[in-house]
From Swiss-Prot:
One of its GO terms (cellular component) is proton-transporting ATP synthase complex. Gene3D superfamilies: 6.10.250.1580. GO terms for molecular function: proton-transporting ATP synthase activity, rotational mechanism; proton-transporting ATPase activity, rotational mechanism. It is found in: Cell membrane. This is ATP synthase subunit b. Its main location: membrane. The gene is atpF. It is a single-pass membrane protein. F-type ATPases have 2 components, F(1) - the catalytic core - and F(0) - the membrane proton channel. F(1) has five subunits: alpha(3), beta(3), gamma(1), delta(1), epsilon(1). F(0) has three main subunits: a(1), b(2) and c(10-14). The alpha and beta chains form an alternating ring which encloses part of the gamma chain. F(1) is attached to F(0) by a central stalk formed by the gamma and epsilon chains, while a peripheral stalk is formed by the delta and b chains. Pfam families: ATP-synt_B (PF00430).
Length: 181
């Protein structure tokens, strides 16, 4: 039985080989394989290599673009930070200038008020002095008038030969004693 199986297997195998040999023609198979190998090298040289180089170049180009974009982003961020700090500095400087201007205006206001008060005080003092001077002049004129009137009255009453200078002294002494002026 084993032999029978073996014989039947070998017959089947022969049949399969015969069928296969009908489909496969060895020289055609060799030419086809050789053509495929040649086609592979031609395609590798003419198509795969340029495509591979194109893909590598594209990959490198994309990597460079990404790197440039990252650099540009970093530079933009740096510029943004720089401009923000400059803007903050300018704002602080403007605030400082405004504060200084406000302080100067306040000091100027206080100086003007102080000067106005001093000038008003000086004018008051000058007016008081002027009033005092005019009062003294008026009193002096009144005194002279009173002296003249008193002399006239005394000369009419006395009708003596007294000298005018002595009369004046006498009247002045009388007025001083009375407290007029």
């Amino acid at each position: 039985m084993l032999q029978e199986n073996f014989v039947s297997c070998s017959k089947e195998r022969e049949v399969q080989l015969a069928v296969l040999s009908e489909f496969i023609h060895i020289p055609t198979f060799i030419y086809t394989a050789l053509n495929l190998v040649i086609l592979y090298f031609i395609l590798k040289r003419l198509l795969f290599k340029p495509v591979w180089e194109f893909m590598e170049n594209r990959k490198n180009s994309i990597a460079e673009s990404m790197e440039k974009a990252e650099k540009g982003k970093a530079e933009a961020l740096e510029l943004k930070n720089k401009y923000e700090s400059e803007l903050n500095e300018a704002y602080a400087k403007a605030q400082k200038i405004l504060k200084e201007a406000e302080e100067k205006a306040k000091q100027e206001y206080e100086r003007i008020i102080r000067d106005a008060k001093n000038e008003a005080e000086a004018l008051k003092l000058k007016a008081k002095e002027e009033i005092e001077r005019e009062k003294n002049e008026a009193l002096k004129e009144i005194r002279n008038e009173v002296v003249s009137l008193a002399l006239e009255a005394a000369s009419k009453v006395l009708e003596a030969n007294m000298d005018t200078e002595e009369n004046r002294k006498l009247v002045n002494r009388f007025i001083d004693e009375q407290g007029v002026a």
